[in-house]
Amino acid sequence: DTSVVICTIGFFSNLRDLLQSGADEYSDLSGKELVAKKVKRLVSMAGLFPEGKEFNVYCDVPASKVVAEEWPTEIVFSGFEIGNVILTGKKLVQMNVENSPVKDAYALCFAEGDPEGRMSWDHTAVLVAIKGYEPYFDVERGTFHVVDDEGTNNWVANPNGRDLRLIEKMPPTEVASLIENYMMHQRSIK
């Protein structure tokens, strides 16, 4: 029924394991068949575009290759270059709120030398998984490849490709402000 969107902000190890799993007591479908039936898309913070090496790809190259080659539905890639210029956290650490693990983590980052904000690599993937890429980003359709055993990736533009990669559309400062507003949200207690 393609009702599921999966977002990954780390290595592809668990998704490789899913693809290679067989039927079990929960489903007669293999992992790959289950993904094909249930998953609309995978949104992933992975890769450096148009070509390069990125941490989430090169830390488990075999898993990255399996997912790149065998994932049965669309993959949207939020590359390193997207989140690298979207800096968040500056307003968050100035909030008058106590006992906030997010605020505390960002305060530590600022103390370690990120005075203008922390790069938002993972945040962009989460934003797109929940809200979609419009109006924040443009996309280019193509194919993501892991080209060597060192985890280098490249991108081949192709209007019929399975994959999408995010391309800057809104100014990074506007995307940062939007993400930071979500990060600063405080639930109302009734």
Model-inferred region functions:
Residues 1-190:
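N-terminal acidic, glycine/proline-rich low-complexity segments
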